[in-house]
Design a protein with these regions (language model features):
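Nucleotide-sugar donor-binding/catalytic module of glycosyltransferases
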Residues: 1-110
Length: 110
């Protein structure tokens, strides 16, 4: 399918101390059947190994997504993290997902 026929969907993952789950979350976005996706990940000052787990996924994200952003910043809380991520989104649609959740493969396609 021609990506120009698909609206861009912005997927936002705010992360805080989810090193055990964040890679599965990111992989579930990579595995989406819908293709025209940008992924924005913001780590909100995690004190565990979340940042390292996210960094391990960067090459796969850069290959898969139309646009990919990963930012780390001091903890400011979920609301401010989501508001900041919204400023970076370029998609027509937004699909936030918690870093300890996973998407079904056709979630965005539907």
């Amino acid at each position: 399918m021609n990506l120009s026929n698909q609206p861009l969907v912005s997927v936002v993952i705010p992360c805080y101390n989810h090193e055990k789950f964040v890679q599965d979350c990111i992989q579930s976005v990579i595995d989406q059947t819908y293709q025209n996706i940008e992924l924005i990940i913001i780590d909100d000052g995690s004190k565990d190994g979340s940042v390292e787990k996210i960094q391990e996924m960067i090459p796969a994200c850069q290959e898969r997504f139309i646009r990919f952003e990963f930012r780390y910043r001091p903890n400011k809380g979920l609301s401010e993290t989501l508001n900041e991520a919204l400023e970076w989104c370029e998609g027509l649609y937004l699909s936030p997902i918690a870093s300890d959740d996973q998407m079904l493969k056709q979630k965005i396609q539907i």
